[in-house]
Amino acid sequence: MIGPKGFINRAALRDKICNQDSTKDRKQVFQSITYHATAFMRAIQKRKAFINNHPKKIELARKIIKMRPNAKIITFSNNVKMAESIGIGTVYTGKDSKKKGRITLEEFNNCDVGVINSCAKLNEGADIKGLSVAIILGLDSSETKSIQRRGRTIRKEGNKIAEIFNIVIDQTIETKWFANSHKTSSFITIDEDGLNDVLLGKTPKPYVKKIKDFTFRY
């Protein structure tokens, strides 16, 4: 139980381990549980940051953007740093003032093509017309957030065809996050070669490699 639950329930865990009459032992065990639980949670946070800010995601996002020059594109990152790192188009995040954010959205709404890079601020509520491509670089296990992000792109507008790219680092916990957040969704899994085919208008080869459950890895 040395983890998030261990941290929350560390007093109860201490009581299971220690003799009720030994105040000194109880204090030492409590401190030890707190130390290890905190270290575990910091490691989990570092793992998530490593996955969310992986440079390969930036590389693939830029490739998609460059291969869709006539599209209106939205990208979703899990943090401002990642959104700013894409380096193509405008950035819309919670760092902006309300006035600047409103102007950014109005200008983008009036464009036929372009890129807007966002994080949580555009998950819901914003009305953006004409989107045809979504690139999701940062994800978690939330099915609600996944549906909201897709909803930004899949809005019926004439005969519009929308593309949604979820960039997932294989053999990491992110594959499990993706599976949990897309339980009721239809999707195809492709590798980078398959992505190149899609971007060139070709039918991608099925990704047949078994996705392993490496929950203990980054």
What positions do the PLM features span?
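Interdomain helical connector at the RecA1-RecA2 junction of SF1/SF2 helicase-like NTPases
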Residues: M1-R68
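Generic hydrophobic alpha-helical segments
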Residues: L60-I65, T104-F108, R150
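Conserved helicase ATPase core of P-loop NTP-dependent helicases/translocases
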Residues: K72-S77, K81-A126, K145-I147
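Conserved nucleotide-binding/hydrolysis micro-motifs of P-loop NTPases
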Residues: K81, L122-N123, L139-S142, I154-R155, ...
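A short beta-strand element within the Helicase C-terminal
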Residues: G114-S118, E124-D140, K145-Q148, I161-I167
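Conserved segment of the helicase C-terminal RecA-like domain
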Residues: R152-S186
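Long, largely alpha-helical accessory region at the distal end of helicase-like NTP-driven motors
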Residues: I190-Y218
